[in-house]
Amino acid sequence: MKPLDDPQHDREVGSRDSTLDTTRIDDVRIGAVRPLITPALLQERVPVRADTLALVEGSRAAIAAVLHGRDDRLVIVVGPCSIHDHDQAIEYALRLKVVAAELQDDLLVVMRAYFEKPRTTVGWKGYINDPHLDGSFAINEGLERARKLLLELTLLGVPTGTEFLDLLSPQFIAELVAWGAIGARTTESQSHRQLASGLSCPVGFKNGTDGSIQVAADAILAACAPHAFMGMTKMGVAAIFETRGNDDCHVILRGGKTPNCDDAGVAASCAVLRAAGLPEQVMVDVSHGNSGKRHEQQIVIALSLIHISEPTRRS
């Protein structure tokens, strides 16, 4: 039996180019259609025990406690830009776990486990989309690898955070995620705001690529509200989802045309949140626009944040 990701498997009526039917006016730019594993089947292949889910639930509750001022620790999301190798991710997690335990009285450490990469133009779109990094787009395998890694990280006792980019991928992995992010390119997207309103984990919205904080504040207000939208169930059936809203959302300052990670940037961001009637809680991204994409600047920025006044530096 051919695997689901076999390039010759079940493309519409069996032909690789069956969708290129010149007599039709629909799907004329679709080169091929392959089957996608259902979330329910993947959950059956990679099951999660109740005690494992309890670890995720506890991590989410701890992060929410920080966001709502019931815990005075700082939430720190740290890790590689994106996941591309399972074994390297596990090795990193084992080292991070040791440091996180040492700092647990002051910091709530979450490991960054990003499987999807938004691109400004084109490029590798992440571990789920192309797990072999060769353009084979073995998406079913990528989903399974991502789920297995999240499960293993959780079993190690390491909470994970990821960016939700594709609107279907949360159905495959979200119950193993302690904290989620909506990126700068999608914060203004209505679909992603609706998605965040139904996610079970705390969610951070990045400011816009131009540095706009208002975009992120608007996103939080939208995510706090109930929504109804189309989606896919765990059984792979199209459905209408009605959400209750997510009040565990916050802003991520990632810079824009200029950095916004200093005292003035944080204060200005808090002013926008205050005007919107939102909690003045921000997380600072020490990379991207704040670092000028120079990794050596990340430590400098992190150290500078220590000196920001206590009421404005909680994340």
Language-model regions, residue ranges each:
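Polybasic, low-complexity association/targeting segments
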Residues: 12-34
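Active-site-facing alpha/beta catalytic cores
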Residues: 21-26, 106-261, 265-266, 289, ...
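N- or domain-start disorder-to-order transition segments that initiate the globular core
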Residues: 30-67
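Metallocofactor- and cofactor-centric catalytic cores in central/energy metabolism, strongly enriched
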Residues: 56-64, 71, 81-84, 88-93, ...
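Acidic (Asp/Glu)-rich catalytic clusters
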Residues: 67-68, 101-104, 152-157, 273-277
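Conserved, mostly hydrophobic/aromatic
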Residues: 79, 284
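Glycine-rich anion/phosphate-binding loops
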Residues: 84-101, 136-148, 303
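Single conserved hydrophobic/aromatic residue that forms the stacking wall/gate
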Residues: 306-315
